[in-house]
């Protein structure tokens, strides 16, 4: 059974000031909770969370793990817009992900059980990943750039036959890491 709980507190002002919204589970639209879509600081008290810049779990994703984020550039270098969030499902602490060169699990395949800051350093010949299988207990974050930079995508256990299955507009993936969940 997946662990899908935790607590995240969103603040309108920097450094945990202004109006706040406490969230304990899926929240598909902050405005429905009487909270504007401007978030300038966040405190993750437990769990790992994926936040989206639009309501209904759409748009750019941001992974937030246990800790304080006093200003929005700590999780997003572009703006303070955020519309929805949900806890990341965690099953335990055994991590495994297989990446594939082609859609539908074809072509070159490489397995990871640890973080990888640059896929090409592990023998991955391209900057693209077209399909993924996430096994084991934990979730993973994919990044479009090396060293855990650029647009990110959170993947939980399951099969992703094409990059659009994880919400990407392109197959560009150059680094990946495990989501570590602290309660």
UniProtKB/Swiss-Prot annotation:
InterPro entries: Beta/Gamma-Crystallin, Beta/gamma_crystallin, G_crystallin-like. Monomer. Belongs to the beta/gamma-crystallin family. The keyword Cell membrane does not apply. Keywords: Eye lens protein, Repeat. This is Gamma-crystallin N. One of its GO terms (biological process) is eye development. Has a two-domain beta-structure, folded into four very similar Greek key motifs. It comes from the Eukaryota. Crystallins are the dominant structural components of the vertebrate eye lens. Also plays an important role for integrity and function of auditory nuclei. Residues 6-46, 47-89, 95-136, 138-180 form the Beta/gamma crystallin 'Greek key' domain. Primordially eye-specific. Present in lens nucleus. In the retina, expression in observed in the outer plexiform layer (containing photoreceptors axons and synapses) and photoreceptor outer segments (at protein level). Also detected in the auditory hindbrain where it is highly expressed in the medial nucleus of the trapezoid body, but also present in other nuclei of the superior olivary complex. The keyword Repeat applies. Pfam families: Crystall (PF00030). One of its GO terms (molecular function) is structural constituent of eye lens. It comes from Mus musculus.
